[in-house]
Amino acid sequence: MRFVYFFFFILIIAGLSQFIRANPAQRPKVWFALGLSAWLASPYHLLFNLWPGWNMWSGYVKGLELTFVDMIAFAILASGIHKREPLRFRLAYLAYFLIVISSTFVSTVPSAAWLYVWQISRMALICIAITRSCADERAAKAIMFGMVLGMFYNALFGIVDHAKGALQSGGLMGHQNLLGLMSHFVALPALALVLGGSREKWLWLGPLGGLIIVVVGGSRATTGLALGAYALLFMLSSMQGWNSRKAMVSGLALIGLIVAAPLAVNTLNKRFEVQEKSDYDERAAFKRAASMMIADHPFGVGANQYTLVANVGGYSQRAGVVWNQGSRAANVHNIYYLYAAETGWLGALAFILLLANAGLLAFKHSWKRRNDWRAQMLLGLAVGIATTAVHSMYEWIMTTYTAQNLLAIDIGLIAGLSTQIKRSVASEARARRESGRTKIETGRAEELALTD
């Protein structure tokens, strides 16, 4: 049956790519669908597995999956939209890709490691498709529109869950930590556009949805980091220039804080009330297990198999991780320790460089044209990447395809928008030089005329 699904997958790609080629005016709808499906592919199972049978695997990738997001990305690339990706992005991703591939040679179960290679290949595909789409200035906001609606839709489900008595809600994502981490990729660039004065009404749903997720999620990391990121973004945006929109947002933010703070504190208090008091620190135990694994395997144990090695190798036992399914089947709650354990410190470093490269490039270009909406979005994307990088010190969920899809989209937007701004700045500089040259030539002509 999976081959039938794959056949239809190919047919849809062919039809959609032809539609994109033949209907340039309709392309924003395709970009919108890509942004929206990044939030809906997992909860509505808009995917199929080319290699089933991995459902009981202990790792975070459980097959050769293809999602609706991948289908749209394939169609965009097949439509013939051409645009070179910045070299620094290609090199950063290539380094990470090669290190992950090298981990397959030291893996206990090499085929499981190759599943993660497949997943990051899909991530690269999405990133390239977004970058090339940004050759059209309509693409970035269309993609952001889809992501904002997808996030807000999840936030509404969180409200419903909370109203029904759920202490913590993960919306449609299944877990509040995943929903909280994913919200950074969308809420912050949307807020940056709002602060910059963009007039699209739907943009307000971004920061509003992010605030709702903070309240209904009850996640300590999400609450602290999201509020800190909003404050940092507001400060940086104000440094770029003050306007009436920022004054209005500051007032609304104060009102929102007065309303939301008691709700968030109440959620956290209820969460801690039901938790049993104990001296056991599970996150610390996970980190001890990962540290021992890294010491024994400096080049890693293979992608997608931390939990296998942690249990079979006795690391969880020696680190004091309690004996139950939830704890022994969990990854270390720190993405950098997890990548270091699986792909070696080089793998962790390559991932850090991938994030740093994107964040720094976005921040750099956000100051080149401060009144340009593209620069404002880049500022939000930079803060979003930085916030996610810090959040990942307390979570492993960046390894899931749902989170990586949004990371790929944001990196693609950064690459595309940075290239646009770079070209605009170069074009303006060229125009100024030509204007100056024209004035000089005109002045010389006038001098000659007076001399004659």
Residue ranges with predicted function:
Residues 219, 298, 321-362, 390:
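A conserved mid-to-late transmembrane alpha helix and its immediate loop/hinge
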Residues 234, 244-247, 343-387:
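Hydrophobic transmembrane alpha-helices and their immediate junctions
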